[in-house]
């Protein structure tokens, strides 16, 4: 009876081991390479946006909203942008500013709306009626893009280490295989004797 329980336990351990093995194999062959490739692409795009931000950076303020409202002050631009109603499309380009497209996104939560600063990569923030929108946009262009770059570099480093570790740990051999084979053989032998 105890031998039967030991064999059942070892079979369960082997099934768990094989499930983990196949998950790790999938991670190594598909998931990790795709993530690493995406992180590298994001880093490359964000680095391009940093160059755009440097190129267009100026202390003079000017923004053209909806191709018809010119504004030379942040306060006036805030007022114009705040009064734009989200369109029935998901996204609506409302302005170009310092080399980036400013997009109003229809997805909203309660009294908040989403704004996207689009370059080679998208930088999102939510705002409500009281938000200083131009301050948020300036802050993202000046600091947020660099923070996003740091975040993806950390993710890439972490994922690369995890990928390397996973490759060294991948082993299809169940560590208790010999024990399982011996106990199964012994159990079969006992069952044959009991049947006779």
Question: Where would I find each of the regions flagged by the language model?
Answer:
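C-terminal accessory region of SF2 helicases/translocases
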Residues: 1-70
